[in-house]
Amino acid sequence: MSIFIGGAWPYANGSLHLGHIASLLPGDILARYYRAKGENVLYVSGSDCNGTPIAIRAKQEGVTAKEIANKYHEEFERCFRNLGFTYDCYTRTDSEHHHETVQNVFLRLLEEGHIYKKTVEQAYCETCTQFLPDRYVEGVCPHCHEEARGDQCDACSAILDPLDLLEKKCKLCGSTPSIQETEHFYFALHTFQEQIKRAVEIAKQTGTWRDNAIQLTERYVKEGLLDRAVSRDLPIGVPIPVEGYEDKKIYVWIEAVTGYYSASKHWAEETGKDDREFWDSEAKTYYVHGKDNIPFHSVIWPAVLLGIGEGAIPRHIVSNEYLTVEKRKLSTSKNWAVWVPDILERYDPDSIRYFLTVNAPENRDTDFSWREFIYSHNSELLGAYGNFVNRTLKFIEKYYGGIMPKGSIDVELKDKIERLYKHVGEAIEQTKFKVALESIFDAVRFANKYFDERQPWKEREDDPVSCEETIYNCVYLIANFANLLEPFLPFSSERIRNTLSIVNRNWEPQHTLPTRIDSVKPLFERIDVKQIERELEKLYGAVK
């Protein structure tokens, strides 16, 4: 089976925060799981280096947009690598390859009659002497009356046009823009109304989209899909490949999401492999992002794919809700966030991955609190999982001189592990990552109980053969926990695999156990709870 996984492209205008990772982490869990199953996986993403936020940041700092994009693209790559993300291709939207692919898609849509020209009114800043693209205009949402950008309201998820906004202001200088006529290209989205309606109906029946994606897309379909501008007067981006319009840029509506397609083509060229199977209607596709990106993946991208004749429209939409910090909404402008480069300096990446999975905003907003983060590490990763691994392997080191005791796998334990693989695998495929991880940790707690009830420290003297059986089965459980947890906690899984000399990495019960165990080290270290206050002081002290 061909599995395509696309992770949303973060804007390269500032550091990643935990909100980004909370929405993107499911992609890596899926990729690791499906590779272990032996499926053909293509997992792609990249940095959005063309977005308006980058141009705005560059202007504010007095540097070029390229300098801003380079800085944060490199930082993103480093952060994703240190968090264990296993992208097959992580690229950027200002690459020559991406520009060429997007222009080809634009021309194909134009040839097929899905794009047309239209004279429209647009916000124009007399002070800055330029037309203002959507994100250069800010104001009040006409629907919910909250603060909004010219393209979308984060408060009510309404898709907007800058002219819809009340109390419009230029983001660059703060002045009120005038309205002037200009010519732009439009995507005939209304012609895909029935196909998008059918797609959301199927998703509702099969449960392959998150509820927020279903509800929001049903709302758009009910209101009637509106044609959307796909060109803008932007300083950076992909030029319109039509004579006389080269100064205009292809707008984010189709440019950014086409990044999945360009990354796929880039991967094919780099590896010499064929990527066509990932765009066939039989491919299983997952798109992983936050709820603010739903319309791009449930409406725009399917319409683009249908317009160019590709069959692999989004089958699974994994659109997480928002992550708050200490019960408050994340705010990058106010510096109310936990920044990824910062947290990675002091904490185990598996601790971050664990917390953001068991507390994932899968169906509702969830909160990151330093207290919960540190206590979850100490009680679950260290106290439950690390404790079971350490007490078992230390027992072998102390009483058997590192030589693996002989034994046979208990039938009940074998059956339990086989059922666990099936249950966890199904949960991952259904994008129920929290359920999957909690199920494994239920088994970890069972394993600790098994160790306590068998009392190998007493069996060693009273019934040495039974003691060997107990420890043998504990190692069997550890080997399989490492395998089951690899999609979630890859770093600690790798440490266990190295300790146990595990070679087989397939998604199946591990029956081959080591003959010797050397250099047993703690799987996790305890975090001093005093660190909670230090982190809170740092967080509150940095607020602007």
Swiss-Prot record:
A motif ('KMSKS' region) lies at residues 329-333. This is Methionine--tRNA ligase 1. Its EC number is 6.1.1.10. Gene3D superfamilies: HUPs (3.40.50.620), Isoleucyl-tRNA Synthetase, Domain 1 (1.10.730.10), Methionyl-tRNA synthetase, Zn-domain (2.20.28.20). Zn(2+) binds at residues 141, 144, 153, 156. GO terms for biological process: methionyl-tRNA aminoacylation. InterPro entries: aa-tRNA-synth_I_CS, Anticodon_Met, M/V/L/I-tRNA-synth_anticd-bd, Met-tRNA_ligase_1, Met-tRNA_synth, Methionyl/Leucyl_tRNA_Synth, MetRS_core, MetRS_Zn. Binds 1 zinc ion per subunit. Its cofactor is Zn(2+). One of its GO terms (molecular function) is metal ion binding. Belongs to the class-I aminoacyl-tRNA synthetase family. MetG type 1 subfamily. GO terms for cellular component: cytosol. Signal peptide: none annotated. Keywords: Aminoacyl-tRNA synthetase, ATP-binding, Cytoplasm, Ligase, Metal-binding, Nucleotide-binding, Protein biosynthesis, Zinc. It is found in: Cytoplasm. Monomer. Is required not only for elongation of protein synthesis but also for the initiation of all mRNA translation through initiator tRNA(fMet) aminoacylation. ATP binds at residue 332. It comes from Bacillus thuringiensis (strain Al Hakam). CDD domains: Anticodon_Ia_Met, MetRS_core. A motif ('HIGH' region) lies at residues 10-20. It catalyses: tRNA(Met) + L-methionine + ATP = L-methionyl-tRNA(Met) + AMP + diphosphate. The keyword Metal-binding applies. HAMAP family: Met_tRNA_synth_type1.
